[in-house]
A protein has these predicted regions:
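Pyridoxal 5′-phosphate
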Residues: 1-389
Length: 389
């Protein structure tokens, strides 16, 4: 899938290159299946059947039923639908929400909006290593808690949580609490079990599908009130576009693209998983030669993400220096451009570590040459740039 051997792209947690097979599937769908899936005549019904197959393919990767998966425009939209949709039907018996303190903005901002409306939102800080403190999270859940939300894999540090285990403990403490999990960085990278989980978010452009498509798992029987309305929703859940969960004519080509990407990721997992683990280990070993560098990711973080701090060169300065070497990393979440990392801040890291942090994120197409180019760039940058600051 690599297009340029001199380009060392190591920011796959921000976005991934669209797989050629995915692009081909999208183009074929655009040109051959142009009918509206809601139409009752032939071309529309052909599109409906293809949409159903795409839904079934995505559902299979989650271990979900076909009727439990809904296509959306992105992971952020999925999070908004799940969070805002779950609160309204439960507000009569509770006003408390428990959420991890290092979530994606598409979770944090809806929570802030709900707090402004009078809901009690308890943010649970991560431990010093960036991992979710499951015991503290569980302790915050009480009989008034209507929603608990956390991400399975943190997008900045790669810290991961056993989502199903925590969800089941939450349900054991309060069966009425809705449990939402942001699985955008976890899907197709770590095993997914939906036990105890009411809603689960995935995104296309993290797995070599295009930007602009995601999906939302909603457990059968999980009651939500969709936050916005549109075509077909007058029929209620069980009819209309995306069964009334998300209005608008379905983006069939991108739904097919998402399903194709998920299938490719599943097929390549046996090769990709150990390969990425080896790249992560190579990077960690190489960083040991750079005494200024400290690691911010926990030891058991997913292999796809490694967060580090140079502690002497500001992130933006080092990022642009590495770019001159053909190496591309990020200073944190691409959705919070220019802002200090609230994840690293929640971990209690000192300002210098936060201001000099870099996130490296792998995909299956990365190579040892990518890692070596990054290490060489960091070594040169630390030797030259540190004297300038």
């Amino acid at each position: 899938m690599r297009q340029n051997e001199s380009l060392h792209y190591l920011d796959n947690a921000a976005t991934t290159l669209v797989a050629p097979q995915v692009a081909d599937a999208i183009y074929k769908t655009m040109t051959e299946h142009w009918g509206n899936p809601s139409s009752l005549y032939g071309p529309g019904q052909a599109s409906r059947r293809l949409l159903d197959r795409a839904r079934a393919a995505v559902a299979a990767t989650l271990g979900a039923g076909t009727g439990e998966v809904f296509f959306t425009g992105c992971g952020s939209e999925s999070n908004n639908i799940a969070i805002l949709g779950a609160v309204e039907p439960r507000s009569a018996w509770g006003k408390k929400i428990v959420v991890s303190g290092f979530e994606h903005p598409s979770v944090v901002l809806p929570m802030q909006r709900l707090a402004e409306k009078g809901f009690e939102v308890a943010f649970i800080a991560p431990g010093p290593d960036g991992s979710l403190d499951g015991e503290a999270f569980l302790a915050a859940v009480d009989r008034h808690t209507i929603l608990a939300a956390f991400m399975q894999v943190n997008n900045e540090t790669g810290a991961q949580v056993d989502a199903a285990a925590l969800a089941q403990r939450i349900k054991a403490k309060n069966p009425r609490t809705a449990v939402h999990v942001d699985g955008v960085q976890a899907w197709m990278r770590v095993p997914v079990s939906l036990a105890g989980i009411d809603s689960y978010t995935v995104s296309g452009h993290k797995i070599h599908a295009p930007k602009g498509v995601g999906a939302l798992y909603l457990r059968r029987g999980h009651n939500i009130q969709p936050p916005y309305l549109g075509g077909g929703q007058e029929k209620g859940v069980g009819g209309g576009q995306e069964l009334g969960v998300r209005p608008g004519t379905e983006n069939l080509p991108y739904a097919v693209g998402l399903a194709t990407a998920a299938s490719l990721m599943h097929e390549n997992a046996a090769r990709r998983t150990p390969h990425v683990a080896a790249l992560n280990a190579r990077l960690r070993a190489g960083l040991e030669r750079l005494p200024e560098v400290t690691l911010n990711s926990p030891a058991d973080a997913v292999n796809e993400v490694l967060n580090l701090s140079t502690n002497c060169v500001r992130s933006e300065t080092m990022l642009h220096f590495l770019e001159t070497k053909g190496v591309y990393v990020s200073s944190g979440s691409a959705c919070s451009r220019g802002a200090a990392s609230h994840t690293l801040g929640a971990m209690g890291l000192p300002p210098r570590a936060i201001d000099t942090a870099l996130r490296v994120s792998f995909c299956g197409d990365n190579t040892e040459a990518d890692v070596d180019a990054l290490l060489a760039g960091l070594e040169e940058g630390l030797a030259t740039l540190a004297r300038l600051q």
